[in-house]
């Protein structure tokens, strides 16, 4: 596609005229549609291969044009400098994604790389780190290089990296012995091993496993922030800030001088710990003696392109006014200083004066710039066919008759084949090999994607996209980084931190106090220290650590500690045991009943089904495809389906359900779609109508929004079989509704229905296929324990290229709120304003009305009548209101694609899972969503709230906040799946133990034996210092992780693997660790030899075999193999168990390892008869 369109364009006279003067003189290029403009700009860049700067009026336009340019130019050569046109951004946690794009761009420019650089106006004006300072902090490390370690680590801190004990997030580094781990903003995490001061090796590593992968010869370490802050910068900042404070103080009202002092003190406080880059970026205008702007980073001969100049000047005016108003308000309220700012206003004008500029505009209009050339292109939009095949046929025939070359761009190879066969059926010849010479009058169908098609008549070229053919949007964008799977999100909530609650299988709920090395009888060992009720403490040897689990329960619940030796824990466990057995019985009975009952068996997919599925405008995610296959598989079996489909909000459950519904209708069955609220019913009804508009399917709605007459007609239609699909609330469960032939019941969020309705659903389940949808994730552990008892399908992957919601955590401030509201309303969007106090919610509306006099503002809360609430919500969905001031009632279920800003007051009072779900309300269309989590200014937060806010900040990446939210949602999901009353039981023993007990109960009822090794746990008691010293592994989490791995070792290969990991992560190990590994090695052989006990008796070592091993051992072989030990070994039999005694010598440990290996080998050889 690239070469073909490029050839056409490069041979055109207008393009050649443009090419001659581009970059030499000021030119105006008019008449090109957005995608045609991107095509011309990309072609010019590819021809010259110089630095090219493309300025747009905002980030949204930059994103749009980037997407089109990426169709032609390799993404390694396309750079964007993404900056929001929003002051609030400077005052909040930065999005790592936007930050990494900015750093990538600045680094490429500083290194003089060629590339096409797309910059929104706001990015162009920002004050930046001086170019020389930036260059000085670009580091390349090579194997064999000598480094000053202290200076190197200091540089990392200047560059915005944070030092941690274990590296798990972008922007962190750690030092352990001679090993430095770094997780750069761009690229993979790296592990640098030093030999004294020389770089001995560089390896990339996996943050999940902490293991190294491949050796690399060199690594580039980019900064972790777009500002470099050195000691000198801090010194300069302190001096300038002091001057600004002293200058501002007398110029503001006396009433706010104290506030100004507090603001000043808060910055000084942070300077002492200095490098909080997030905070100090607000003071960029005081940081550097000579700050740079982006133009300073470009080469002198860079080509400059300006997109829609008049629109940029408009944006510049608005931006200047906004910034000035914002800063004035900040200064007047004592929250800012005179001289504080973020941008150089005149930088854009300076750019235009210093360079020859190519201005692109769609229409010719007067511009206040000198122009030497005007080049007019004639470009027409393409007819929108939207699946109207007659119009499509005649238009394509016209193109062919007029000798046009037609290029049809589609997303995938499969679609190429589909479109080709469709056009061939219309008798329109197509070509698929784009490398052939294409003549006029031919249609080429090829893979590719632009935001829209275009026609260049004088070139006789027309480009048509899927958007014109079928009304689908283009989706090709720069690939985003892989999203973390649910399993990985949840994995690290198991990490134990000091102070965490734990559950000991035998002793109950306690508190984890850390790992402690104790001396017991002259030997040092590590123990897990646990606190119980009162002053009780328990030291658990690390080799028994599998009896200790992290206590996980509903959010913010602190459990009661158990008393050591008390009976309370035994009683609690017995109650839970009874409860899980009851559940297991119920599940097994349901399962058996379903296996025996006979339902309708659907046929294979029809041709209509395939056509219907092809109409879906997006690519399915792998999880969606798998779920659809599982559901169809169930429908094609004789027993009734009862499947639960879980997937996060917006992950595409509805499409899966719609396909199942269509399949049922094609087989002559009726479908009932049951939803918990009237609004959801309306939304699902509209989705079904839109998806099935081209097929003969009769769809009706039963809800309060329907008249009595309409509902009566629907009921008659259901009874007669005229209605195929009915969507509705619990009204569908009424006795007065009769179906002619109901085949499929789809239930959305079953847990939101009352007991009576659930009972009715249960009776329907007996002979109808049922598909239940839920947005609450089901925990994997629970998923595993229910395998074979409950059919579950899980959608864990989000749709490709869904924009991540930009999340800001900010102190509450009227300026921020006003800016956020204005920004959303100016793009004709809507806002959810979350205020969780019903008693003063109307006052809040009045406040916002004063702030935004022209906005229509509605209120929604749980104390309104159901009718009022639904009508308000519906009006909001229909865009009759701009802002909805609401309580958490919007947490589930409402889909308002046009509402893409969420503001939450007092976010510190919400639970993480709540915040996570609320945030899922925005960013659900093709626009970027914004979430502002506000917390009261100057409020002293309690520890939990502070932790929670810290965690919310990490929501901007897939950080631990995400994992905790997932944890809480999973527990909620468990409660929903097993019934609300189980919540209490889960909380009483902790989620993990509960899941384990449930799995054991289900397996026992199904007659599945637990796989347990024949050999019991081997006791090895040797007088050796065998542990992981704190000097070797500082992180307690890492220690526990290694102990867990050693506990699971069953083969020599696994042991070698742990040894490799220790050397890889922590360098060569000391003697205490070597002894620990020796003991594990002895255990491995003892396990396979049937040894029960190895005990140090002081002068000798006693080894006792199990009675079975005593029977199986080949004694003759043992004596033959152990001859080198001579008299040091004695063998006897006591109580049917072989008893081996080894007298200790200097080398007794080696002798013991040898002896245990000999016993194992003697097991494998049978006595000769």
UniProtKB/Swiss-Prot annotation:
GO terms for molecular function: ATP binding; damaged DNA binding; DNA helicase activity; hydrolase activity. GO terms for biological process: regulation of DNA-templated transcription; transcription-coupled nucleotide-excision repair, DNA damage recognition. GO terms for cellular component: cytoplasm. PROSITE patterns: HELICASE_ATP_BIND_1, HELICASE_CTER. Residues 634-795 form the Helicase ATP-binding domain. It comes from Staphylococcus epidermidis (strain ATCC 12228 / FDA PCI 1200). ATP binds at residues 647-654. Its main location: cytoplasm. A motif (DEEQ box) lies at residues 748-751. The gene is mfd. InterPro entries: CarD-like/TRCF_RID (IPR003711), CarD-like/TRCF_RID_sf (IPR036101), DEAD/DEAH_box_helicase_dom (IPR011545), Helicase_ATP-bd (IPR014001), Helicase_C-like (IPR001650), Mfd (IPR004576), P-loop_NTPase (IPR027417), RecG/Mfd (IPR047112). It comes from the Bacteria. This is Transcription-repair-coupling factor.
């Amino acid at each position: 596609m690239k070469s073909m369109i490029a050839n056409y364009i490069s041979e055109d006279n207008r393009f050649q005229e443009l090419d001659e003067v581009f970059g030499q003189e000021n030119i105006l290029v008019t008449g090109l549609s957005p995608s045609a403009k991107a095509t011309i700009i990309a072609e010019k860049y590819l021809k010259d291969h110089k630095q090219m700067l493309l300025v747009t009026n905002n980030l949204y336009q930059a994103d749009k044009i980037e997407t089109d340019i990426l169709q032609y130019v390799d993404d390694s050569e396309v750079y964007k400098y993404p900056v929001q046109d929003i002051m609030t951004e400077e005052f909040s946690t930065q999005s790592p994604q936007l930050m990494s794009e900015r750093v990538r761009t600045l680094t490429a420019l500083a290194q003089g790389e060629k590339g096409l650089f797309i910059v929104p106006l706001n990015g162009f004006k920002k004050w930046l780190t001086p170019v020389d300072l930036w260059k000085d902090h670009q580091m390349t490390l090579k194997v064999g290089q000598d480094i000053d370690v202290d200076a190197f680590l200091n540089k990392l801190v200047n560059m915005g990296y944070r030092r941690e004990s274990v590296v798990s997030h972008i922007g962190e580094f750690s030092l352990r012995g001679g090993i430095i781990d770094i997780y750069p903003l761009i690229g993979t995490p790296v592990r640098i091993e030093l030999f004294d001061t020389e770089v001995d090796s560089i390896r990339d590593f996996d943050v999940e496993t902490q293991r190294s992968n491949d050796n690399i010869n060199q690594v580039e370490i980019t900064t972790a922030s777009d500002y470099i802050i050195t000691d000198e910068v801090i010194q300069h900042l302190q001096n300038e800030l002091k001057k600004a404070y002293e200058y501002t103080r007398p110029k503001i009202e006396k009433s706010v001088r104290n506030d100004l002092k507090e603001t000043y003190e808060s910055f000084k406080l942070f300077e002492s710990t200095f490098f909080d880059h997030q905070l100090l970026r607000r003071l960029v205008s005081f940081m550097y003696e000579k700050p740079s702007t982006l133009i300073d980073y470009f080469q002198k001969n860079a080509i400059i392109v300006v997109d829609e100049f008049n629109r940029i000047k408009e944006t510049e005016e608005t931006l200047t006014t906004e910034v000035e108003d914002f800063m004035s308000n900040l200064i007047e309220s004592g929250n800012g200083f005179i001289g504080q700012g973020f941008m150089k206003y005149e930088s854009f004008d300076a750019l235009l004066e210093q360079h020859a500029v190519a201005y692109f505009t769609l229409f010719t209009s007067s511009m206040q710039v000198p122009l030497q050339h005007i080049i007019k292109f004639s470009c027409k939009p393409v007819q929108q066919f939207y699946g109207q095949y007659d119009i499509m046929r005649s238009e394509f025939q016209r193109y062919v008759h007029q000798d046009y070359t037609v290029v049809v761009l589609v997303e995938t190879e499969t679609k190429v084949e589909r479109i080709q066969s469709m056009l061939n059926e219309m008798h329109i010849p197509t070509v698929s090999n784009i490398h052939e010479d294409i003549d006029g009058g031919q249609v080429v169908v090829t893979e590719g994607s632009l935001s829209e098609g275009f026609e260049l008549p004088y070139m006789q070229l027309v480009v048509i996209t899927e958007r014109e053919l079928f009304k689908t949007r283009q989706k090709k964008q720069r690939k985003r980084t892989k999203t973390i799977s649910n399993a990985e999100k949840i994995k690290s909530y198991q990490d134990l931190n000091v102070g965490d609650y734990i559950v000991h299988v035998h002793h109950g709920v306690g508190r984890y106090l850390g790992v402690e090395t104790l001396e017991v009888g002259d030997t040092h060992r590590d123990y897990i220290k646990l606190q119980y009720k009162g002053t009780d403490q328990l030291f658990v040897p690390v080799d028994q650590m599998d009896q200790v689990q992290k206590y996980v329960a509903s959010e913010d619940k602190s459990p009661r500690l158990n008393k050591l030796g008390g009976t309370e824990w035994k009683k609690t466990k017995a109650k839970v045991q009874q409860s899980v057995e009851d559940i297991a019985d119920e599940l097994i009975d349901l399962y058996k009943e379903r296996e025996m009952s006979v339902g309708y068996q659907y046929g294979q997919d029809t041709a209509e089904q395939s056509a219907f599925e092809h109409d879906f405008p997006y690519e399915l995610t792998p999880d969606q495809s798998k779920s659809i296959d599982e559901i169809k598989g169930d429908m094609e079996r004789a027993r009734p389906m009862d499947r639960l489909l879980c997937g996060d909000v917006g992950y595409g459950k509805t499409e899966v359900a719609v396909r199942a519904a269509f399949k049922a209708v094609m087989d002559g069955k009726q479908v009932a779609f049951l939803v918990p609220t009237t609004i959801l019913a309306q939304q699902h009804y509209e989705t079904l109508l839109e998806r099935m508009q081209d097929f003969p399917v009769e769809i009706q709605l039963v809800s309060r929004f329907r008249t009595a007459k309409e509902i009566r007609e629907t009921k008659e239609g259901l009874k007669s079989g005229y209605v195929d699909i009915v969507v509705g609330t619990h009204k569908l469960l009424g006795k007065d509704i009769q179906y002619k032939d109901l085949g499929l019941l789809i239930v959305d969020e079953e847990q939101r229905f009352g007991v009576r309705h659930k009972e009715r659903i249960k009776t329907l389940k007996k002979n109808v296929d049922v598909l239940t949808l839920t947005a609450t994730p089901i925990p994997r552990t629970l998923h595993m324990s229910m395998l074979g008892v409950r059919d579950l399908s899980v959608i864990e992957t989000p749709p490709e290229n869904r924009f991540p919601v930009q999340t800001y955590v900010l102190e509450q401030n009227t300026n921020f709120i006003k800016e956020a509201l204005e920004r959303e309303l100016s793009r004709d969007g809507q806002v959810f304003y979350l205020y969780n106090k019903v008693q003063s919610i109307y006052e809040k509306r009045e406040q916002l009305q004063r702030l935004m006099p022209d906005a229509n503002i509605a209120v929604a809360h749980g104390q309104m009548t159901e009718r009022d609430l639904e009508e308000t919500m519906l009006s909001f969905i229909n865009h009759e209101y701009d802002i909805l001031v609401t309580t958490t009632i919007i947490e589930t279920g409402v889909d308002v694609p046009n509402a893409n800003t969420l503001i939450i007051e007092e976010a510190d009072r919400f639970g993480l899972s709540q915040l996570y779900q609320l945030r899922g309300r925005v960013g659900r269309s093709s626009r970027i969503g914004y979430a502002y989590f506000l917390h009261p200014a100057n409020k002293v937060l309690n520890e939990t709230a502070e932790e929670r806010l810290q965690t919310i900040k990490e929501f901007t990446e897939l950080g631990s906040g995400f994992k905790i939210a997932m944890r809480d949602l999973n527990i909620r999901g468990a409660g929903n799946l097993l019934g609300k009353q189980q919540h209490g039981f889960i909380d009483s023993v902790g989620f993990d133990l509960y899941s384990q007990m449930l799995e054991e109960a289900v397996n026992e009822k199904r007659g599945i034996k637990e796989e347990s090794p024949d050999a019991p746990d081997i006791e090895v008691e040797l007088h050796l210092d065998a542990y992981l010293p704190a000097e070797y592994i500082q992180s307690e989490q890492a220690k526990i992780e290694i102990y867990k791995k050693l506990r699971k070792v069953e083969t020599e290969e696994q042991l070698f693997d742990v040894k490799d990991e220790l050397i890889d992560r922590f360098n060569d190990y000391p003697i205490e660790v070597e002894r620990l590994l020796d003991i594990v090695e002895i255990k491995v052989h003892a396990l396979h030899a049937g040894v029960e006990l190895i005990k140090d008796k002081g002068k000798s070592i006693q080894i006792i075999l199990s009675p079975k091993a005593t029977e199986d051992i080949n004694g003759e072989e043992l004596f033959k193999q152990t001859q080198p030990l001579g008299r040091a070994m004695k063998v006897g039999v006591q109580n049917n168990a072989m008893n081996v005694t080894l007298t200790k010598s200097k080398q007794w440990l080696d002798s013991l390892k040898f002896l245990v290996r000999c016993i194992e080998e003697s097991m494998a050889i049978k006595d000769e008869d």
